[in-house]
Amino acid sequence: MNWEDGDLDAIAHWANGELAIGEAIQAVARLRSVPSGTALIREGDELDEVYLILKGTISAIVYSSSGHEIRLGTLEAGEWVGEVAALTGGARSAFAIAARDSRIAVLPAASFITLMETYGSFATQISRLLSERLAATSRRMFEFAAFSAAGRIYSEMIRLSVPGQDAEQLYLSPAPSVTELAARLSIARETTSRVISRLERMQLIVREPQQWRVLAPKALSDMIN
């Protein structure tokens, strides 16, 4: 399998303008295709590898003792998978499953650590990544305990939205599916569908083929509880 032009975009983000970092990543990485639905990592695995998503989407998932699926997060192109286990030397704490066909750069854990030791800017970016993920996990734990299912959906919609040309509106683009939104939050699809339909009836959102528009961001934010 050969490197493609799009692959280099994911690497360039972490190279941070330093050509040597990008070249070092390519030198130690091998490419792998992961079909949709395939487990890249299984909980409890003791793999000596780190993964950089070049294309596609990977979902981090754990299962409760009763078999209930809990979605920890969704990782897109340009994001790392398995970096914590590489740094701690521990077993993998969650499943990593391809949500769509994906291309992955596979790095030996030792090479990943060497990159951090060699390039300070790379180490700083990885440290920032770990801090952001810890903050996101803490936020989700708080929301799970403090908010209703509807409140968590409202909060996630605002979080995923970006401003558009109309300063009074927010946009979710590309448009998420109800199934994807439910999975992100570990909420039943039927519940999520009812909440979204209610927002449409209240004329707070408009669902279009390519995007969702939040017509009244403040009103939606005020409903979070």
Language-model regions: role of each:
Residues 32, 51, 73, 97, ...:
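Residues that recognize and position ribonucleotide moieties
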Residues 158-225:
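Phosphate-/nucleic-acid-contacting segments
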Residues 1-36, 85-86, 118:
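Cyclic nucleotide-binding regulatory module and flanking cytosolic helices
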Residues 117-188:
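Polybasic "coupling" helices that flank or enter modular domains
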Residues 12-13, 38-100:
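Cyclic nucleotide-binding regulatory domains
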Residues 21, 27, 73-131, 135:
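Cyclic-nucleotide recognition modules
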Residues 61, 83-84, 114-115, 156, ...:
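Residues that scaffold the ATP/ADP-binding catalytic core of kinase and kinase-like folds
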